[in-house]
Curated annotation (Swiss-Prot):
Taxonomic lineage from the root: Eukaryota, Metazoa, Chordata, Craniata, Vertebrata
Protein name (record): Serum amyloid P-component
Keyword annotations: Amyloid, Calcium, Lectin, Metal-binding, Secreted
Cofactor, free-text remark: Binds 2 calcium ions per subunit.
Subcellular location field: Secreted
Gene Ontology molecular-function annotations: carbohydrate binding; metal ion binding
Organism: Anarhichas lupus (Atlantic wolffish)
Any GO CC annotation of this UniProt entry: extracellular region
Domain Pentraxin (PTX) span(s) in chain numbering: 1-30
């Protein structure tokens, strides 16, 4: 899991976190 989002999206469950990571990663062009 991206450590960059550890403090941002780790508040959500794993499934929700995965969805958010995908969206955030896409937004950051990561």
């Amino acid at each position: 899991a991206p450590q960059d989002l550890s403090g941002k999206m780790f508040i959500f469950p794993q499934e929700t976190s995965t969805a958010n990571v995908x969206l955030t990663a896409r937004s950051q062009d990561f």
